[in-house]
From Swiss-Prot:
It comes from the Eukaryota. The keyword Transmembrane applies. Belongs to the H-rev107 family. It comes from Homo sapiens (Human). It holds the Pfam family LRAT. Optimum pH is 9. Signal peptide: none annotated. The gene is PLAAT3. The lineage of its organism: Eukaryota, Metazoa, Chordata, Craniata, Vertebrata. This is Phospholipase A and acyltransferase 3. It catalyses: a 1,2-diacyl-sn-glycero-3-phosphocholine + H2O = a 1-acyl-sn-glycero-3-phosphocholine + a fatty acid + H(+); a 1,2-diacyl-sn-glycero-3-phosphocholine + H2O = a 2-acyl-sn-glycero-3-phosphocholine + a fatty acid + H(+); 1,2-dihexadecanoyl-sn-glycero-3-phosphocholine + H2O = 1-hexadecanoyl-sn-glycero-3-phosphocholine + hexadecanoate + H(+); 1,2-dihexadecanoyl-sn-glycero-3-phosphocholine + H2O = 2-hexadecanoyl-sn-glycero-3-phosphocholine + hexadecanoate + H(+). Residues 155-162 are lumenal. InterPro entries: H-rev107_PLA/AT, LRAT_dom. GO terms for molecular function: acyltransferase activity; lipid binding; N-acyltransferase activity; phospholipase A1 activity; phospholipase A2 activity.
Length: 162
């Protein structure tokens, strides 16, 4: 039997499992979250929308967690509590509530929803999704370079034998 999802507490980070990425929000109580909503997170835009990669603005929204998650699974994930001390809960919520309704800068690689919630909870803007993609791309690039080098060496060796 699967363990039940723990009830979020104010100030908790909520990780929402979209089909191709993770969306992040911060729980502020009474069923509500505050999150950064680029066009891909606007109702009807489609969960797999690439619109967030094409925009530089997002709206800070306060919505019911149930509505933001929709049919996607979610979990409480305060994953950096071991590295950073969370700010006091009252400060997290105050900062989040003050931003609701504001249009803010949005960059997929440096100012996305994960950066936003980590800044609110820890005072440190970071995104592991971005880091993981950069690492994967670097590893893939090195692999392709190594394969190309092996191919060149193999073809030279083959020509020398002829």
């Amino acid at each position: 039997m699967r363990a039940p999802i723990p009830e979020p507490k104010p100030g908790d980070l909520i990780e929402i499992f979209r089909p191709f990425y993770r969306h992040w929000a911060i729980y502020v109580g009474d069923g509500y979250v505050v999150h950064l909503a680029p066009p891909s997170e606007v109702a009807g835009a489609g969960a797999a929308s690439v619109m967030s990669a094409l925009t530089d603005k997002a709206i800070v929204k306060k919505e019911l967690l149930y509505d933001v998650a929709g049919s996607d699974k979610y979990q409480v994930n305060n994953k950096h509590d071991d590295k950073y001390s969370p700010l006091p809960c009252s400060k997290i919520i105050q900062r989040a509530e003050e931003l609701v309704g504001q249009e803010v800068l949005y960059k997929l690689t440096s100012e996305n929803c994960e950066h936003f919630v980590n800044e609110l909870r820890y005072g440190v803007a970071r995104s592991d999704q971005v880091r993981d993609v950069i690492i994967a791309a670097s590893v893939a690039g090195m692999g392709l370079a190594a394969m190309s080098l092996i191919g060149v060496m193999f073809s030279r060796n083959k020509r020398q034998k002829q």
